[in-house]
Amino acid sequence: MTKRSEAKYKIDRRMGQNIWGRPKSPVNRREYGPGQHGQRRKGKLSDFGVQLRAKQKLKGYYANISERQFHGIYVEAGRLKGDTGENLIGILERRLDTVVFRAKFVSTMFAARQFINHGHIKVNGRKVNIASYQVKPGDVIEVKEASKQLAVVLEATQLAERDVPDYIEADHSKMTAKFIRIPALSDVPFAVQMEPHLIVEFYSR
């Protein structure tokens, strides 16, 4: 198992949930946290603990976004019209690394970030190597021609464990995807329940 995989599954173990729905997640085999003391029974979490856990889970899901970056996204969500929690999810789902993952161009959020950083992705015909780039409805995302036959791409398109959500139109024969609309929380195919309202409560303390 690579260091990247170890870090990814450590998030699962810490949360005690298979947050990406992966068949190889260690929490499919055990229900306790990482480390030698992970089997100890945990007490009931305080309201603060529940809110913090919700934040850590969502940050972890999106490839362990840094606290500084995540808080910036929260502030941006609060400036938009509508529900802050819904806006938070909308911004996260518009990230280029998220769209590349959702389109099944790569198999994990972590791989999506690396794939973009290495210059394998174009948006509307222009190379974009910033994982946090905000995609807009109507944008077309594509894998560069020279990258379409990479093993990481070919393997990801065959994954049976998840489907492309309906707010993205993906054509794997051309390795292109069109971002149709900004999704609501209920549209996003999370493998576990995400609770952005608890994150709003956390930052509103």
Curated annotation (Swiss-Prot):
<dbReference type="InterPro" id="IPR022801">
    <property type="entry name" value="Ribosomal_uS4"/>
</dbReference>
<dbReference type="GO" id="GO:0042274">
    <property type="term" value="P:ribosomal small subunit biogenesis"/>
</dbReference>
<keyword id="KW-0699">rRNA-binding</keyword>
<comment type="subunit">
    <text>Part of the 30S ribosomal subunit. Contacts protein S5. The interaction surface between S4 and S5 is involved in control of translational fidelity.</text>
</comment>
<comment type="similarity">
    <text>Belongs to the universal ribosomal protein uS4 family.</text>
</comment>
<keyword id="KW-0694">RNA-binding</keyword>
<dbReference type="GO" id="GO:0003735">
    <property type="term" value="F:structural constituent of ribosome"/>
</dbReference>
<protein>
    <recommendedName>
        <fullName>Small ribosomal subunit protein uS4</fullName>
    </recommendedName>
</protein>
<keyword id="KW-0689">Ribosomal protein</keyword>
<comment type="function">
    <text>With S5 and S12 plays an important role in translational accuracy.</text>
</comment>
<dbReference type="InterPro" id="IPR002942">
    <property type="entry name" value="S4_RNA-bd"/>
</dbReference>
<feature type="region of interest" description="Disordered">
    <location>
        <begin position="18"/>
        <end position="46"/>
    </location>
</feature>
<feature type="domain" description="S4 RNA-binding">
    <location>
        <begin position="94"/>
        <end position="154"/>
    </location>
</feature>
<dbReference type="Pfam" id="PF00163">
    <property type="entry name" value="Ribosomal_S4"/>
</dbReference>
<keyword id="KW-0687">Ribonucleoprotein</keyword>
<dbReference type="InterPro" id="IPR001912">
    <property type="entry name" value="Ribosomal_uS4_N"/>
</dbReference>
<dbReference type="InterPro" id="IPR018079">
    <property type="entry name" value="Ribosomal_uS4_CS"/>
</dbReference>
<dbReference type="Pfam" id="PF01479">
    <property type="entry name" value="S4"/>
</dbReference>
<dbReference type="InterPro" id="IPR005709">
    <property type="entry name" value="Ribosomal_uS4_bac-type"/>
</dbReference>
<comment type="function">
    <text>One of the primary rRNA binding proteins, it binds directly to 16S rRNA where it nucleates assembly of the body of the 30S subunit.</text>
</comment>
<dbReference type="InterPro" id="IPR036986">
    <property type="entry name" value="S4_RNA-bd_sf"/>
</dbReference>
<dbReference type="GO" id="GO:0015935">
    <property type="term" value="C:small ribosomal subunit"/>
</dbReference>
<dbReference type="GO" id="GO:0006412">
    <property type="term" value="P:translation"/>
</dbReference>
<dbReference type="GO" id="GO:0019843">
    <property type="term" value="F:rRNA binding"/>
</dbReference>
